[in-house]
Amino acid sequence: MITKFSKIEEVERAERMAADMGAGFLVGVGGGRSIDVAKLASVRVGVPFVSIPTAASHDGICSAQASLTIDGETTSVSAQAPFGIVADTAIISQAPKRLLAAGCGDIISNITAVRDWKLAHRLRGEEYSEYASALSRNDRDDDRRDRLT
């Protein structure tokens, strides 16, 4: 199925198609909209999904969250992380450069947000979650760098 919007109606349409076919897994190919629709539909149908991005513009290609429009408002919905990711660099490299720049910004923002959170925890007693932190970045690599600096 081809999706033009990341709306709950598209998720429901994908669910119906998956149920009618008896699908064992779903595949999201393209950008955020297609991947988010497949991500949420797959969890609602109870099957894994595979993410096949065509641009590296954000971390949604590998996250367990789906951004959807529900009742006219964009919201983040808990779904599931992909069972696998197939990223063809020959295809991704053909995407507009602004999308790659956006993806780099997304990665940097995740790293700095977690560091800000840790600092607020140390200085102000802000509640901190190692689990949530690990979802944002590779904790072990960052902690290794912390010990070296």
Where do the protein language model's features map onto the residues?
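ATP/NTP phosphate-donor binding region
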Residues: 1-25, 95, 102
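Glycine-/small-residue-rich active-site loops that bind phosphorylated ligands and cofactors
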Residues: 3-6, 33, 56, 92
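Short active-site-adjacent helix-start/loop capping segments
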Residues: 5-9, 35-37, 60
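A generic local structural motif
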Residues: 12-15, 35-37, 71-73
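A short, small-residue-rich loop immediately preceding and capping a beta-strand
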Residues: 18-41, 45-54
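A glycine/threonine-rich phosphate-anchoring loop and its flanking beta-alpha core
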Residues: 43-145
